[in-house]
Amino acid sequence: MRLSRFFLPILKETPKEAEIVSHRLMLRAGMMRQEAAGIYAWLPLGLRVLKKIEAIVREEQNRAGAIELLMPTLQLADLWRESGRYDAYGPEMLRIQDRHKRELLYGPTNEEMITEIFRSYVRSYKSLPLNLYHIQWKFRDEQRPRFGVMRGREFLMKDAYSFDIDEVGARLSYNRMFVAYLRTFARMGLKAIPMRAETGPIGGDLSHEFIVLAETGESGVYIDKDVLDLPVPGTDVDYDGDLTPIVKQWTTAYAATEDVHDGARYEREVPEERRVHTRGIEVGQIFYFGTKYSESMKALVAGPDGVEQPIHGGSYGVGVSRLVGAIIEACHDDAGIKWPEAVAPFTVAILNLKQGAGDTDAACERLYRELSAKGVDVLYDDTDQRAGAKFATADLIGIPWQVMVGPKGLAEGKVEIKRRGDGTRENVALEDAVERLMA
């Protein structure tokens, strides 16, 4: 993509309403625009990141055996009355009527609807286990939306729902999602730590939050430092095998949010030199809620003995749009964003330091053409901005690799490559630049 043809509305000053780093940088970098309190338009740069994150989430859900569908944003109020949650949910649920006075709601979550879909088609235990997921926009009418996409009213979520004949099977499904989440966040360059959590309005008695450590996080967390060094399962993980050892490994060392923190246990089990008290951002949560919805909504299947029984369910959420902010909170410096390569809007930025000069134009065009042919996402800054402004823009929007092409370097047949993550620079021959970037 040529920057001269791309829509990138960079802001020179930080809007006053932006309180945290991710909100400030997303606005300044032209990733989004606020349309109403807690509601944002995703501009091209931000949308590219959102799509990269969504793709990783989808790939790991598919790898774990979940099956994608898509449910509507609007739901019938009667479904929620059937489960008993319509009145239990507070004013954060947006309730509306259509022209026929039918009561609807803008779904904040989808347990009722997925249960309705399941009970309409599945009759036997032979169709289980089953895990269905979708990635859809949701709305919760937060009383005080703030922090940009971290606590907005409209947000993109991945929701998966598992169905099993009994608790044993349901816990196996829970473990699959537990491991899938470890892999999902690791692929995004994040260290997300699973912590035992309250179940809240979802219900059930088993839940884990996945927390990314960040000083600007909304939750205080207490962890054993050893958990930071635990290995993440590789692509060869067997989702049909016994995942209990992996789950046990990740849940044995102490890790808790302040809501469920046990100070006495923490001091008893964790040596002082391994205690870490910091803050974190929730990027996902998983639940096992048993027969909470299947009993009230009569989602029954015939067991091996032919007798109908309620299924055991679980739900598994990832805040896709929230992850954009969480990654920025964990990956930034004073100059701007430092995107992990897997989620960056572009992988390489080519900076033409003397636009209009024949040699620099030709070298940039060559690099742009060769990298694009190899499938690399390239942003070619072919604008007439001065070099300093180009450096600042590339740093602000966080492109992982920057290639500086100027007449001084080209006089020696070289270009300069900068790695945004750690700031390292190296001069390489022009003809070797593509190979170096592909290494």
From Swiss-Prot:
Catalytic activity: tRNA(Pro) + L-proline + ATP = L-prolyl-tRNA(Pro) + AMP + diphosphate
Short name of one Pfam family: tRNA-synt_2b
Keywords from the UniProt entry: Aminoacyl-tRNA synthetase, ATP-binding, Cytoplasm, Ligase, Nucleotide-binding, Protein biosynthesis
Stored InterPro entries: aa-tRNA-synt_IIb, aa-tRNA-synth_II, aa-tRNA-synth_II/BPL/LPL, Anticodon-bd, Anticodon-bd_dom_sf, Pro-tRNA-ligase_IIa, Pro-tRNA-synth_IIa_bac-type, Pro-tRNA_synthetase
Gene Ontology biological-process entries: prolyl-tRNA aminoacylation
Keyword Aminoacyl-tRNA synthetase belongs to the record: yes
EC number in record: 6.1.1.15
PROSITE patterns reported for this sequence: AA_TRNA_LIGASE_II (PS50862)
GO cellular component terms, semicolon-separated: cytosol
Compartments where found: Cytoplasm
Recorded GO MF terms: ATP binding; proline-tRNA ligase activity
Record Gene3D superfamilies: Anticodon-binding domain, Bira Bifunctional Protein, Domain 2
Statement: the UniProt record of this protein carries the keyword Nucleotide-binding: yes
Role: Catalyzes the attachment of proline to tRNA(Pro) in a two-step reaction: proline is first activated by ATP to form Pro-AMP and then transferred to the acceptor end of tRNA(Pro).
Subunit and partners: Homodimer.
Family: Belongs to the class-II aminoacyl-tRNA synthetase family. ProS type 2 subfamily.
Identification of the protein by name: Proline--tRNA ligase
Organism: Nitrobacter hamburgensis (strain DSM 10229 / NCIMB 13809 / X14)
